[in-house]
């Protein structure tokens, strides 16, 4: 799909009514190598981490029956239960969710947990919330290191963690081989202060995977749009970003992040997005001398 890179597709790109086995089967038939599972702030998704075993058994069976893997987790539950909360009970819940997400990943063979880079989301950010977030990240990295599960910070839709440069400060502080970065090309491109080419170069050696998503840029007159932007209608120059990553020698996976819309065909929408992105990747290959086969 994207040269020699593995390709992933987000769980939420599919109709939520279908089973995991059907979701994985559709992903395989569309040409993907794996699916990224979502543990967001909804109770039913957080509950997966607290299940007595039924959820894991279903997922293991679905993977075995389809020959597909769930290789990564998008862990955005910390938007609701942030490490930087002023409430000690919320901070404790953040750690419990992280602890269970790591155990869940070990049980299922998930390699990478993508973290949400918010000190807080529904509370005001303060020096105390930033300090608590740092403490939480130090703890989380140690917990992940013990279990050999990679934690990778997403570049976000708020100023707190909206660049690879900001992440690298945390990486330097934490100093763990199990705490890296998982940039979202859409979020990275939406902030005018970012030079995406320089940001990607700065992160090389730390980038474990890349989210493919389009966005509407943040400007003085527009707050930006970070979700459900059709590929090709936003601000991301995918050809340039692919070319930069290829020149830098990036070998990790590309993961398409998109969301199912009611009344649509998930397979048709995903196939259309994948085709469009493959065309941009082919353009990038020409720019760098055709070093891979699309």
Task: List PLM regions with ranges.
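N-terminal pre-domain/capping segments
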Residues: 1-107, 138, 176, 205, ...
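Histidine-acidic metal/acid-base catalytic patches
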Residues: 1-8, 13-33, 160-183, 189-294
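A short, structure-level motif marking secondary-structure boundaries and short turns
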Residues: 7-10, 43-46, 85-88, 124-126, ...
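Active-site acidic/histidine proton-transfer and metal-coordination neighborhood
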Residues: 21-25, 62-66, 81-180, 268
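Residue-level detector of anion-binding/catalytic polar loops
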Residues: 33-34, 69, 111, 150, ...
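Conserved beta-strand positions in the central sheet of alpha/beta enzyme cores
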Residues: 36, 72, 114, 152, ...
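Flexible loop residues that form catalytic
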Residues: 40, 78, 118, 215, ...
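A short acidic, helix-capping loop that chelates divalent metal ions and anchors anionic groups
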Residues: 43-47, 79-85, 121-126, 189-191, ...
């Amino acid at each position: 799909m994207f040269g020699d890179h593995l390709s992933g597709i987000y769980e939420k790109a599919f109709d939520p009514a279908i089973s995991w086995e059907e979701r994985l089967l559709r992903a395989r038939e569309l040409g993907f190598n794996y699916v990224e599972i979502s543990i967001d702030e909804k109770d039913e998704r957080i509950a997966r981490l607290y299940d007595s075993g039924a959820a894991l058994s279903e997922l293991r069976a679905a993977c075995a029956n389809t020959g597909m893997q769930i290789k990564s987790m998008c862990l955005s539950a910390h938007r609701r239960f942030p490490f930087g909360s002023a409430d000690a009970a919320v901070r404790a819940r953040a750690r419990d969710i992280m602890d269970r997400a790591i155990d869940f990943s070990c049980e299922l063979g998930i390699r990478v947990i993508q973290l949400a880079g918010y000190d807080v989301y529904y509370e005001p950010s303060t020096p105390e919330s930033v300090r608590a977030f740092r403490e939480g990240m130090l703890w989380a990295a140690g917990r992940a290191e013990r279990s050999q599960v990679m934690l990778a910070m997403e570049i976000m839709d708020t100023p707190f963690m909206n660049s690879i440069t900001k992440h690298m400060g945390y990486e330097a502080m934490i100093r763990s081989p199990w705490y890296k970065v998982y940039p979202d090309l859409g979020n990275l491109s939406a902030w005018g202060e970012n030079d995406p080419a320089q940001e990607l170069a700065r992160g090389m050696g730390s980038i474990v995977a890349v989210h493919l998503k389009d966005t509407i840029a943040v400007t003085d007159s527009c707050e930006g749009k970070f979700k459900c932007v059709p590929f090709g209608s936003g601000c991301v120059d995918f050809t340039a970003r692919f070319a930069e990553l290829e020149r830098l020698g990036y070998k990790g996976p590309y993961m398409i992040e998109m969301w199912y819309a009611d009344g649509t065909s998930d397979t048709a929408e995903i196939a259309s997005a994948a085709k469009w992105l493959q065309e941009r990747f082919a353009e990038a290959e020409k720019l760098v001398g055709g070093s891979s086969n699309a």
